[in-house]
Amino acid sequence: MQTNELLDKIFRGARSQNGWLPTPVPDSKLRELYDLMKFGPTSVNCSPARLVFVRTEEGREKLRPALAPGNVEKTMAAPVVAIVGYDTRFYEQLPDLFPHNPAVKAWFEGDEKVDFANTTAFRNGTLQGGYLIAAARALGLDCGPMSGFNNQAIDQAFFAGTSIRSNFICGLGHGDPEKVFARSPRLSFEQACQLA
């Protein structure tokens, strides 16, 4: 694939989906997706993202009560819904993830460092969520990211008793081109950027 084709596939031609074709996404594709996105950089390789790939009827029914009314139909129709979460105790994995500096775990441990740890987890987990979308599109999947849901309800249903918190959800599969909205405008370089 040529560079421009790939950029179109991931960015210029890709669209947030509002409807889905009934084409299944195999578990092997979800593994391939994670095994690609995990290579995106994070601060001190902290890798705080934690994912739940909701793909069964039982999982969907756990998810349904947390969704905003306007998001129920399209979310329930997605072959897979990724819950993109972040682990606020990500630093427990740092001895394995950042082995050349064993002291780095201590940067985040302790009551006085909770805010720093939580901010780091949220920021880098969000970054990894962006990698998930880019990787999914590169692998030929469409995405429907959204934040129209009750985080506390998701956390209770899927992460109770853990240090993981939900950030956003993202439908994955093959989108229905008939249900894609017209592309909304984007800010120009001059509106969004400065050269310093």
Curated annotation (Swiss-Prot):
InterPro entries: Nitroreductase, Nitroreductase-like, Nitroreductase_HadB/RutE, RutE-like. Gene3D superfamilies: NADH Oxidase. Its EC number is 1.-.-.-. One of its GO terms (molecular function) is oxidoreductase activity. Keywords: Flavoprotein, FMN, NAD, NADP, Oxidoreductase. Its cofactor is FMN. CDD domains: RutE-like. It is an enzyme of class 1 (oxidoreductase). Belongs to the nitroreductase family. HadB/RutE subfamily. Coiled coil: none annotated. Pfam families: Nitroreductase. This is Putative NADH dehydrogenase/NAD(P)H nitroreductase Reut_A1586. It comes from Cupriavidus pinatubonensis (strain JMP 134 / LMG 1197) (Cupriavidus necator (strain JMP 134)).
